[in-house]
Amino acid sequence: MSTIRLTILIDYCGEIVEIVPFLFDIIQETHKDIYKETTEEIVKGNSNEGQSISPPPHQPSTDQADIEALKDSYDDFLYVSKAFASCSINSLIATARIYGLNPAPIKGARVLELGSSCGGNIIPQALYYPEATFTGIDLSSVQIKHGNELIESMGLTNVTLLEKDIMDIDDDFGTFDYILVHGIWSWVPDIVKDKILSICNRNLSDRGIAYVSYNTYPGWKRLEQMRDIMLYSEKQLKSQSLQERTVYTKNVLKLLGETMNMDQRSQERSGYKIANINSVLASNDYYVGHEYLETFNDPVYVSEFIERA
């Protein structure tokens, strides 16, 4: 079976300065209610001369516990579901035709979205394209429930949301003309990454298009520095909810940005770094939490993705 795979790349660029050593002393002093029992552990963790403050690189696990943890995370801290123009059916068809391909027509098309959340990306398309059918799956029962309530209230009959693990999709699930995977691939364990690519091969129709977005290098080399700072600053707060940890780490970045702004030389040399901090601070908490504080965020070079696919 011949398939069409179009890869849409999301390339984030940013950079963060090395953290000021005394910054955590200030943070601990101003957040005694949270850090009252952690000072000893932080000092112990920095006892070696020249030791890096960044956490060790995450080693992806294939344990089912990681998948369950992701489900709990999105159940507890909902990710607001939105429509993305880049993976709308008309956009994918137009892009395919530009490259000389002959994609499946919208009429009668079957569309599958992996990690659909509340359906914010496919419900508008189901409304706009009544002759196509849409199926979204997501681990989060809470998000699926919200999405189905919206579908019912709108009286739509051509879109379905299912609480389902990507790992459970097999050949019997059927084939689809369009498979959408927006904001999922970089944020799941390797075993799920491989399963996504398998679905894009085995469950894609002959004239199908698979859309996969992911974080890429080299742009994310810079943002990983910011992620390291956030992970380090919240590593003693694992008993707190993701939402609480997100608020806390944004305050850390705010303090870092204010500290840099106090120094004229930093402003002149690192204005773009301050801008990156401000960009995170201006972002919604649900985005920052799931983007920077989840267990998995694995950017790759485009060539690496192509080799893996």
Positions of predicted regions on the chain:
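A short glycine-rich, Lys/Arg-flanked "PGG" loop and its adjoining helix->strand segment in the class I
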Residues: 194-206
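Conserved alpha-helix/loop element of class I SAM-dependent methyltransferases that forms part
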Residues: 76, 84-109
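Conserved SAM-binding motif I beta-strand of class I
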Residues: 133-138
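Conserved SAM-binding strand-loop segment of SAM-dependent methyltransferases
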Residues: 155-166
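Conserved SAM-binding loop of SAM-dependent methyltransferases across substrates and taxa
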Residues: 118-131
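Conserved class I S-adenosyl-L-methionine
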Residues: 209-240, 255-265
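Conserved SAM/SAH-binding beta-strand->alpha-helix loop
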Residues: 140-142
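A short acidic, Gly/Pro-enriched loop at the edge of an enzyme's catalytic core
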Residues: 170-179
